[in-house]
Structure formats: structure tokens, C-alpha cells
Amino acid sequence: MPPKLRNFDKSMEKYTDVVLVVKQERFYVSRAILSEHCTYFQSLFCGDSNYQEHIISDVEPQDFQKFLEVVHGEPAIFEATVQKILPLAQKFGSKTVLQKCERFLITISTVRLSTKWNLAKQYGLDELQAHCKLEFKTAQIVRKNPQPEPKSLAYSDKFIFDHSFEKVDGLAEGDMRRSQPITHLDFTWTIYITRKNQHLRVSLCCGKAHLTSDWTVRADFKMTLTAKGSPDLVSDTKGFFHLDSEKNFYWELGQEVEWDEIRDKCLADGKLEVETRVRIVKIRELPVEEFKPPRIVTVNAVKSYEGVLPPTKVLFGDFPFPKALAKEKPDYSDYIRVTPLTQQAKTSAPAETPDLQTPPRQQASAKPQASPAKSAGAPQLPQKVPLFPSGGAPSSPSAPEAPSEPPPPKIYPTLGANAPPAPPVQGKKFILKNVFGNVEAMKCHTAMACQKAVAYDFEWNLIISQKNNRLHVSLCCSKSNVTSEFRILADFELIIAGKNGGRPLKSKTNGCFNIEKTKNSSQELGQDVEWSTIVYDYMVDGRLTVEAHVNITRVTCLDAPKFKKLRNFDATGNSWDVMLIVAGQRFFVLKEILISNSARFKNIISKINFTAAPSTEIKLPDSSADHFQNFLEACYGDPSINDDTVHGILKIAQSYEAAGIVKRCEEYVIKYSKKTLEQKEKLAKHHNLKTLKAHCDYWKSRRKCC
């Protein structure tokens, strides 16, 4: 049996009003607490309130000790005690204890499923019964399909490796450095850094020795650049590494950071420390003999195809040449159609499928001839062709005649004083549309924005910016004179109109806009597109038409309380003998509960003469009334500790020396919290939680060993 978490011996006689005798062992408890949680004791104490002792039969003292600990909010439910506590909870009619045992059996317990089912039926635990039924169905599916799908090899693994680059401050424009490669799951992994266009690209490369087949490796990875005296620079990337056996070609994925930011924040004596945490999601081998249809490029879209060809997934990520294998007649509505730039033999597409051999940028201009030297190496972008004036045509006779251009749409000046105001938009669904002028003259690190429209009490507008030979198209949400913090969840689709009536470029995003409590707060979300793609396929006489279809799904005010009250501490319908005043709000509580949980309240209450004033007011120092509400609920044994309330409860508990509540909060963060390791470590340092700090240190050391 686990050790005692709370004493109910003679030392508590001064603060209790009734004694329960269980097989000659005496438990000093409070009538009010037991009556609050148990219908049995509510009836027992109702008749004769002056009787000081009651005998409890057919109960073991050690089991009753654990039951009382759970009633008083202690974490006393374990594998060794749950089946002892359940019959007492049913005997004494305690719904709170039954719910805690049920939650333990669902989320933590490792006993057999049949044992859980029997306990659920015996004690009427409906949620546990539903959980067991779901587990039974899952087990039946596993038994029916014991063998994995043979078509693809699936691996799931995580690893971390880091490297310290020396003399990074001496990198010249175009210089590249790489780390020593490591081998994991028969693949080699290398970190690259490259300085180009006043940026430093930090990337991860995946390769394989003796490449005889094509491979795709799906991986999610986080790259951390250690900063000096400021938060580290962290970037998350999800993508596919494609290994081409024919060209012996490897992929690299990564992010770009401004060189000035790297130099000012991350370089210490010329050293740059890079840590990469990689999670391999899936590895698939594509044998050479498999038929390879024409390749297509997708922009931020993920689709799966199953048909005549082997089932594959669209490859996506931050790399210049995403590729995919399509089935015979796929839907090309969301794709930009191009030809493999180093294709050796021209293949003709079926008549039913769209023309995949001539990309839109080459249908309106002469197709540049690729040199044999470039064809033998990695894929290269087509040479930049000059832009022709309105109505003009390229000089190449092989290009088809361009269709007549429709009348130009009305152009709104961007960020101009004379721009017509956008009409107000009503409802949760709306469309923003703007024609940006003189886009071809945009320089690097410049931006244009359209007029703002009002929807759902927030201001919305479209923004385009040029950076690193890419055009960033984004939707911006803002609000002036913000008095509260807001979080806006929205689904939106950005559409760039095609050139000469061509296929538009679409990208869908599920975004969260965070509006902070400042004078003018805004946030933008969007997508990046290659600048050459914009120039050749979507820009008409320097104009670019952008449209956003927005659906606001949820607006949350972060200043609103993140919890609902589990218990009302008002004067009606509540047993109380002392009133606490916190930030002007009154809490009617029992002094026995305060004394049993808090050493500071024990000291305060011991100095008050309750004989002269049976119901006394105690005014406490100002603090958050919401946090104090959660703290009192925890003292009463309610499950009020969660990720949203744990910080506030810890603050109040440490202020009033409630060691038991602090211990429960610490145990919750270690066992149940979904906070990140960094957030847990910050919480441990802020509240000086030694056990939680040791827990975080242990898992940090495990990370470094991986």
C-alpha cells in the first residue's frame, strides 16, 4: 500500500468536528467536507449534529485512509488502490471519487481490458464502458489484419544531430559549408549552410550510397540556430527528399535567414551551432522498372492517387523542384502544368489528358534550348525571356498565336492616398480582390498592399512582397486600438489569376491570426511562389490580380476566462463559516478546508475568535479572482488543474503555503500536461519546482543522446 499523503490523526483534532472509528482506528475529519462529497455522510450527520463519534463497519482502515485522501483532493489513486477505492466510493455515494477513478482507468491504468470492462459494469462507469467498446473494436481490426500493407515500406523514427560551423563570419557571397554526414536507416544526412543574396540558407540533405532505385523519404524536421542572449531561431519544415538513381540527384530542404540577423544574434566568435531534430515519417522505394508518367508541380497542395499506376503521394516542401507521380487521368485543376526540364525523350500525353508537354510559360513564348551540359546535371530553370508589351508577340515562329487580351480590369493604386475605399463586408464569409499595378518593378524586400475591408469587426487586406526571388502573397488581419487580445481562426484560399485566361494558381490555408493588445496590431498569413513563375505565367503588363476567399470559423477573446466554474462559492446552497474577499469578490468557504490545505490560512484562522463572530470576513491581498477560484476548487478536491489554470493555481498555492496543492500541480505537469518540454522547464524555474526541473533535465539529456 502506498504511503500516507495526509494525516487524519489526533493532531487534526483542533480543526475538525467529528471522529470516524474504523476497526479501532480513529479518523479526525470535517462534517462539511464529507457531507459535500458523500451522500452517506450527508444523511449520517443530518440527524444529530452534536454527536462526536461514528463507527464505520465493514471497511478496512488502510482503504478508508486512501478514500479520505481522494475526497480531500490528494492524488491517491494508483493501480494498487483503485480497486480498493471504488467500492468505498459506491458505498458512501461519492460521485467525485467515482469520476476520478474512472478517469484514471481510462487514461493511465494498464490493467487488462477485460478487468476494466468488469469494473465499468460493476460500478456503472458509462465513459469507461464506451472506452472499452472502442478498444475491443480496435483489437478486432488488428486481429483481422495482422500483416502490414506490403506495397510500401513504412518506418517511423526520430533522431537528433548537431554541428558547429567554424569561421562563419568569413563566408563570402556564394560560399557553402557542410557538416560531416551521418548515417541513419541506411541514408546519409548532412547539414549545409550557404550564403547568397544577403541571406544564409540552412538546409538538411538526404542521400544514399550505391543508389540503384528511386527513393522518397518523408520527413519533418526542426532546425535550431543557437542565439546568444536571445531566443534561439527555430524553423519547422515538412517535406519529401527525392533520391533519383538515374541522375544520382539528392534533395535538400531548409530555410533562409537574413545574414544580418545571423551575424548579430547567432555568431559567437565566428561559430554557428545548428541542431536538427528529424522525424522520419515514411520511406518508399520506387523501382527503376516502374513506369514514370509526366511530372507535375504543385503549390502547397497534398493529394493521393490510386489507379493503374502505383499509388504515390504528391511531394511538397521548401525546395525548388517538387515532383509527383500521377495516375492516368488525374484532376489537374489545382496544379501548374510543366514538363520535366531535363527530359531526354519527348513523350506524348493521351488525348484525354491536358497538354503536359508545353508549360504555360512556353506556350506564349519561344521554348529555350537547353544546353547538353545543363541537361546532364541537376534540373535548371528555363532562361528568362523578355516581357512583351500589350498585344505583342514573341519573335519565335514556333509559338502559337496569343489570344486577344480582354479589357484590362480597373486598377486600384496600392497604398495610395486617392485609392477608392473598399466597401464594408458583412458576415463570416467574404471575398477580397485587388489588381496590383507595376508589380514587375518591385525590388527585393519591398511590399504592396490594397485598401482594407472590414469584416467581423476586423480589418482585412491583401499584401504582396518580393524577397529572395520569390513573391509572398498573404492575407493580413488587423485591428486598431485593440483593448483585448483576439485569436481568429479562418480558412482562406488565395487565387492568382492566370495570364491570358490561363489556369489560376490556388492555395488553401487554415490559419490563426493573433491580435495583440497594442495600438495597431496585425498579422499576415500566406504562401510563397517563385518570382519567375509569377512573371511568365500570371503577370499581365506588370499587373497581378489576387483574390482571397475567406471563411472566418472562430473568433476567441483571450482575455475571457479560459475555464468554467466547477463550484460556486456563494452564500446560497453552500456550507460556509468564513468569507474571503479577493479583488472585491466574495468567496464563502469552510475554514476546515482552508486549514487542511494551507499553512498560511491555518495561521490566519488560528488568530481569529470565531466564538465572538461566527461568520467572519477576511480580506486578502489583491490577486486574480479567477486564479483564486481555481485554487479553492483544487482545495475542495475538484479537477480544476489543467494546462490553462496550473500557472495561476501554483502562484496562489505558493503564496498561501499550500504544499499539497503545489505537489498536485507538479504531478499534473509531469504526467498529464501537453505543454512542451521548454514550457515545463520555464514553469519549473518560475515556481522553483525541483521535481519538475529534474524531470525536464532527464528528458533533455535523453534528447542529446539520441
UniProtKB/Swiss-Prot annotation:
Residues 344-419 are annotated as: Disordered. Residues 16-80, 576-644 form the BTB domain. SUPFAM superfamilies: POZ domain, TRAF domain-like. Pfam families: BTB (PF00651), MATH (PF00917). Keywords: Repeat. InterPro entries: BTB-MATH_domain_protein (IPR052664), BTB/POZ_dom (IPR000210), MATH/TRAF_dom (IPR002083), SKP1/BTB/POZ_sf (IPR011333), TRAF-like (IPR008974). Residues 359-380, 389-402 have a biased composition (Low complexity). Disulfide bonds: none annotated. Residues 165-280, 455-552 form the MATH domain. This is BTB and MATH domain-containing protein 47. It comes from Caenorhabditis elegans. The lineage of its organism: Eukaryota, Metazoa, Ecdysozoa, Nematoda, Chromadorea.
